[in-house]
Amino acid sequence: MTLEEQFLSYLKNERSYSPKTVLAYQKDLAAAKKFWQENGGFPGWDQISRRDLEIYLLATGQKLASSTLSRKLSSLKSFYRFLTRRGLVKADPTVAIQLRRGKKKLPEFFYQDEVGQVIRSLNDGKPLTVRNRAIVALFYATGMRLSELTDLKIKQLDLENGMILVHGKGNKDRYVFFDQESKKYLEEYLQAARPSLLKNEPDTGAVFLNKLGRPISSRGIAKAVQQIFQKAGLTAGAHPHELRHSFATAMLNNGADLRSVQELLGHEDLSTTQIYTHVSMQHLTVEYRQHFPRK
């Protein structure tokens, strides 16, 4: 039996939980697992870190009531408590995680100069570095999801017009755009670094490749982003989701219409996009208090 199956069997047979309650736990575990599979890869329950959980709760919490998010965290806490007591995992990553009641945590993001600092640090000309520079630039310029960038094919790129046809969630297509600087980094990767990485491997048409010349995985991209930001001295726990947040926040801070940002992000519900207006207001409040002349 899988770890999930052992846990669900324990709830049903030893704790005598109702079928409805057991099903709720099953759905909560499946939702978390699916999120990680689509956003960095799922290495196994014994490899999930506190940071993985925080990213999941942050992303999920933008579109759920606080009570629903609390239930999801409670399910994961119960699951890991079971696993640790049975010796099925060594550590419980949920131990130190608490939700602030009644208030959703605002998305974490990077300022434009911070992203610029990271991009400028990727300058040694090595194929993987050129690839990583293109990845960071595209994440920030387009706001694409990790799964969307991972699955990106060359045929989806329109370099001349600075556009990408993105195959989003629920088989919904949309166009995103990128600037001249990102175009330069992408072209440098496609023209020199990608052929160097590809070597004698069959060309699948995937835009981003790993060091073996094969399509890079979501987890490979997530790991690369984390290492890039850590090496640049910004944070030890950066995730592609935060570059997506950074794109949305930058657009709104510079006067973009909320519905336009919704379209670019591929959000089905406007309320999911509205969380970024709170981030923008928080930023503006800080700027006002720092720079308004009357103290």
Curated annotation (Swiss-Prot):
Gene3D superfamilies: 1.10.150.130, Intergrase catalytic core. One of its GO terms (molecular function) is DNA binding. CDD domains: INT_XerDC_C (cd00798). It holds the Pfam family Phage_int_SAM_1. Its main location: cytoplasm. Residues 1-84 form the Core-binding (CB) domain. The active site is at residues 145, 169, 241, 244, 267, 276. Residues 105-289 form the Tyr recombinase domain. It is found in: Cytoplasm. Site-specific tyrosine recombinase, which acts by catalyzing the cutting and rejoining of the recombining DNA molecules. The XerC-XerD complex is essential to convert dimers of the bacterial chromosome into monomers to permit their segregation at cell division. It also contributes to the segregational stability of plasmids. Forms a cyclic heterotetrameric complex composed of two molecules of XerC and two molecules of XerD. PANTHER family: PHAGE INTEGRASE-RELATED (PTHR30349), TYROSINE RECOMBINASE XERC (PTHR30349:SF77). HAMAP family: Recomb_XerC_XerD. NCBIfam families: PRK00283.1 (NF001399), recomb_XerA_Arch (NF040815), recomb_XerC (TIGR02224). Belongs to the 'phage' integrase family. XerC subfamily. This is Tyrosine recombinase XerC. It comes from Lactobacillus delbrueckii subsp. bulgaricus (strain ATCC 11842 / DSM 20081 / BCRC 10696 / JCM 1002 / NBRC 13953 / NCIMB 11778 / NCTC 12712 / WDCM 00102 / Lb 14). The gene is xerC.
